[in-house]
């Protein structure tokens, strides 16, 4: 799968841009602030309806415009000429819209799963060093990329959680005296939260089990050490007997989702008094964390900058390989990656991804990108994307 043409209208800094692409490597070269990342961000948005740079869509619409349009022609594969035209209209004042082959979709999220991407950028350092929310976002993003229907599950969970929190807040401070007011209403929300939450948690655990052995292999390939990278899942729900941390890639027994939902419900019941006092839900995936290790030590707080960077990159490369193992050929985006790597790690990274259907690279300096990934190159600057003329070789 690869993007063979990208068109932007009023997206970020671009009034308009038309960019032909090809399978293999494409590199966008330009100084910082010239718009090269905007191009790969647009490809990411077509794939995920989100950006790795911002939490809402407002900055994606060019200042002074009412809407932005991202349009991409996606080809099925290097040996498959079938293609689809994907289009997303990002509106500043009303709901976004999406189309496939000019036909409008009922909901924008129906476009998810047509184009798959794996994006690595300097922001990914937060997955290793940042807050639990950064690691949850990474894992949930991979879950939705694997199974696009999980976007609706996640949305449903967030809706129920919001409504349950509103109920708890209205009863906050009443403690045990609120029991008569809660009655069946709280039980209904608990059941719905546990059922949907168990589905989301099960998908997270399955994905973590699958991606970590691949991440460990990628880390050893990139870093000049042979440390094993592992992960454990810190849950508010007792997972003993249901799931154990992944060590090696081997077939695992599917998680008993019914038992997981029952444990979720039991934990909610035990924490209800505390929740009534605090006015917020204290149990569920929104409270969980993924603990990453390099060797015997937790990466957060102990790993060096170089180790953290290598682990963050390995997580994305593991994600890329997992999707390929699932039968999906994603577009790989390496946004300002090579400037942070020494020559040895650059070459190792390039060698590990060169066989991808499509690799989109951004760089301030052309010489940072290994020769085997040069491929098609563009100069980016002044709101234009032009054929490369060698102005940023040093």
Swiss-Prot record:
<dbReference type="GO" id="GO:0003697">
    <property type="term" value="F:single-stranded DNA binding"/>
</dbReference>
<dbReference type="InterPro" id="IPR042174">
    <property type="entry name" value="RecF_2"/>
</dbReference>
<dbReference type="GO" id="GO:0006260">
    <property type="term" value="P:DNA replication"/>
</dbReference>
<keyword id="KW-0235">DNA replication</keyword>
<dbReference type="InterPro" id="IPR027417">
    <property type="entry name" value="P-loop_NTPase"/>
</dbReference>
<dbReference type="GO" id="GO:0005737">
    <property type="term" value="C:cytoplasm"/>
</dbReference>
<keyword id="KW-0234">DNA repair</keyword>
<keyword id="KW-0227">DNA damage</keyword>
<dbReference type="GO" id="GO:0009432">
    <property type="term" value="P:SOS response"/>
</dbReference>
<keyword id="KW-0067">ATP-binding</keyword>
<keyword id="KW-0742">SOS response</keyword>
<protein>
    <recommendedName>
        <fullName>DNA replication and repair protein RecF</fullName>
    </recommendedName>
</protein>
<keyword id="KW-0238">DNA-binding</keyword>
<dbReference type="GO" id="GO:0005524">
    <property type="term" value="F:ATP binding"/>
</dbReference>
<dbReference type="GO" id="GO:0006302">
    <property type="term" value="P:double-strand break repair"/>
</dbReference>
<comment type="function">
    <text>The RecF protein is involved in DNA metabolism; it is required for DNA replication and normal SOS inducibility. RecF binds preferentially to single-stranded, linear DNA. It also seems to bind ATP.</text>
</comment>
<keyword id="KW-0547">Nucleotide-binding</keyword>
<keyword id="KW-0963">Cytoplasm</keyword>
<dbReference type="InterPro" id="IPR001238">
    <property type="entry name" value="DNA-binding_RecF"/>
</dbReference>
<dbReference type="Pfam" id="PF02463">
    <property type="entry name" value="SMC_N"/>
</dbReference>
<comment type="similarity">
    <text>Belongs to the RecF family.</text>
</comment>
<dbReference type="InterPro" id="IPR018078">
    <property type="entry name" value="DNA-binding_RecF_CS"/>
</dbReference>
<feature type="binding site">
    <location>
        <begin position="30"/>
        <end position="37"/>
    </location>
    <ligand>
        <name>ATP</name>
    </ligand>
</feature>
<dbReference type="GO" id="GO:0000731">
    <property type="term" value="P:DNA synthesis involved in DNA repair"/>
</dbReference>
<dbReference type="InterPro" id="IPR003395">
    <property type="entry name" value="RecF/RecN/SMC_N"/>
</dbReference>
């Amino acid at each position: 799968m690869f993007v063979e043409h990208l068109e932007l209208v009023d997206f970020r800094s671009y009034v308009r841009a038309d960019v032909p692409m090809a399978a293999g490597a494409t590199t966008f070269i330009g100084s910082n602030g010239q718009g090269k990342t905007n191009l790969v961000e647009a490809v990411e948005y077509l794939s995920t309806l989100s950006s790795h740079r911002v939490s809402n869509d407002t900055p994606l619409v060019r200042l002074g415009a009412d809407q932005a349009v991202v349009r991409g022609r996606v080809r099925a594969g290097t040996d498959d000429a079938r293609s689809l035209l994907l289009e997303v209209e990002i509106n500043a004042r009303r709901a976004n819209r999406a189309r496939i082959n000019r036909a409008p979709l009922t909901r924008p999220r129906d476009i998810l799963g047509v184009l798959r991407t794996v994006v690595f950028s300097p922001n990914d350092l937060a997955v290793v060093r940042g807050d639990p929310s950064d690691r949850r976002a990474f894992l949930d993003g991979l879950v939705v990329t694997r199974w696009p229907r999980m976007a609706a599950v996640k949305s449903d969970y967030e809706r129920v959680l919001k409504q349950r929190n509103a109920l708890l807040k209205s009863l906050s401070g009443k403690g045990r005296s609120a029991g008569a007011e809660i009655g069946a209403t709280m039980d209904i929300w608990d059941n719905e939260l546990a059922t949907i939450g168990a589905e989301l948690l099960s998908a997270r655990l399955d994905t973590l089990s699958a991606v970590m052995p691949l991440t460990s292999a990628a880390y050893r390939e990139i870093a000049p050490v042979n440390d094993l990278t592992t992960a454990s899942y810190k849950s508010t729900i007792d997972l003993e007997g249901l799931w154990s941390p992944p060590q090696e890639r081997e077939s695992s027994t599917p998680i008993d989702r019914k038992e997981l939902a029952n444990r979720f419900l039991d934990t909610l019941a035990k924490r209800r008094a505390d929740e009534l006092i605090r006015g917020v839900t204290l149990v569920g995936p929104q409270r969980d964390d993924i603990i990453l290790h390099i060797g015997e030590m937790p990466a957060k707080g102990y790993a060096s900058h170089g180790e953290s960077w290598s682990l963050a990159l390995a997580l994305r490369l593991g994600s890329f390989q997992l999707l390929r193992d699932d039968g999906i050929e994603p577009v790989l985006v390496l946004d300002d990656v090579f400037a942070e790597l020494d020559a040895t790690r650059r070459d190792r990274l390039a060698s590990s991804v060169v066989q991808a259907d499509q690799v989109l690279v951004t760089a301030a300096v052309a010489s940072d990108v290994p020769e085997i990934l040069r491929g098609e190159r563009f100069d980016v600057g002044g709101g234009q994307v032009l054929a490369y003329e060698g102005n940023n070789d040093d």
